[in-house]
Curated annotation (Swiss-Prot):
Residue positions the entry lists as glycosylated: 28
GO terms for biological process, alphabetical: plant-type cell wall loosening; sexual reproduction
Protein name per the record: Expansin-B5
Top-rank lineage group of the source organism: Eukaryota
Every Expansin-like EG45 domain range: 63-173
Length: 275
């Protein structure tokens, strides 16, 4: 295992996910810039490097820089995650993006690709040795091995790998976790499980029944976005959320955060991007 600096965040107690009867829609047009990273359709593999961190059968770190916390060890992530070097993490804008990775240069490598999600940052050390570096969970790293050879592959520590960007397919709808520090004048949300691009270029919010139109949220850190009331008055729920993916696709979850919302709870929408 290759050690590296880790981000330390407060790990919150897991709270229930609430399903709400909300509606939404997706618009498949490009808003602003188009992502320069291919989604893997019709493009070949690129060369990079891989290491692993955390326990041999673990999920890397539950204090990761994207903010997903203990969710990384649960479905749909299922510990198949990686901390991305700077070109992959992109100051948090790469959180939630999906990649296939395979290794062939070690006798323990199966040559079969595994799919991982970027959930953390690897900002220095070995993660700067290649243009793209994945510091994978022990589970994901071992999954590249031939049957029964996971420990042997992990003992190599550092691998040359091939990777490509692929669409995310989370098999559930987008969810929004309200940050524990939110209050009537400040709302911060963690965006999870966006299909397709996986990453987000922008997040907008609309207060109760269209009041004030769409307002741009600011990226707080990782996959968390925030809005402060600048009127001196409390923000007015229910809140609709509009997501713009890295390639410009727009998805709207109407009234997804209800009146009476509570900090620390997760609210699941009824919408997601096409995978």
């Amino acid at each position: 295992m290759v050690s590296r600096g880790t981000f330390v965040f407060a790990v919150l107690v897991a709270l229930p996910i609430l399903s709400l009867p909300v509606s939404g829609y997706e618009q498949n047009y490009t808003a602003g810039r188009r992502s320069t990273m291919s989604l893997g359709r019709g493009y070949g593999w690129s060369s990079g490097g891989a290491t692993w961190y955390g326990g041999p059968q673990g999920d890397g770190s539950e204090g990761g820089a994207c903010g997903y916390q203990s969710a990384v060890g649960q479905r749909p992530f299922s510990s198949m995650i990686a901390a991305g070097g700077p070109s992959l993490f992109k100051n948090g804008k790469g959180c939630g993006s999906c990649y296939q990775i395979k290794c062939t240069g070690n006798r323990a490598c199966s040559g079969r690709p595994v799919t991982v999600v970027i959930t953390d940052s690897c900002p220095g050390g070995v993660c700067l040795n290649e243009a793209a570096h994945f510091d994978m969970s022990g589970t994901a790293f071992g999954a590249m091995a031939n049957r029964g050879m996971g420990d042997r592959l992990r003992s190599a520590g550092v691998l040359k790998i091939q990777y490509k960007r692929v669409p995310c397919r989370f098999a559930m709808n987008v969810a929004f976790k309200v940050d524990a520090g939110s209050n009537p004048y400040y709302l911060a949300i963690l965006v999870q499980y966006a299909n397709g691009d996986g990453d987000l270029a922008a997040v907008h919010i609309m207060e109760a029944r269209g009041g004030g139109g769409w307002k741009a949220m600011q990226q707080s850190w990782g996959a968390t976005w925030r809005l402060n009331s600048n009127t001196g008055k409390p923000l007015s729920p229910p809140f609709s959320i509009r997501l713009t993916s890295g390639s410009g696709k727009v998805l709207v979850a109407n009234n997804v955060i209800p009146s009476g919302w509570q900090a620390g709870l997760t609210y699941r929408s009824t919408v997601n991007y096409a995978a």
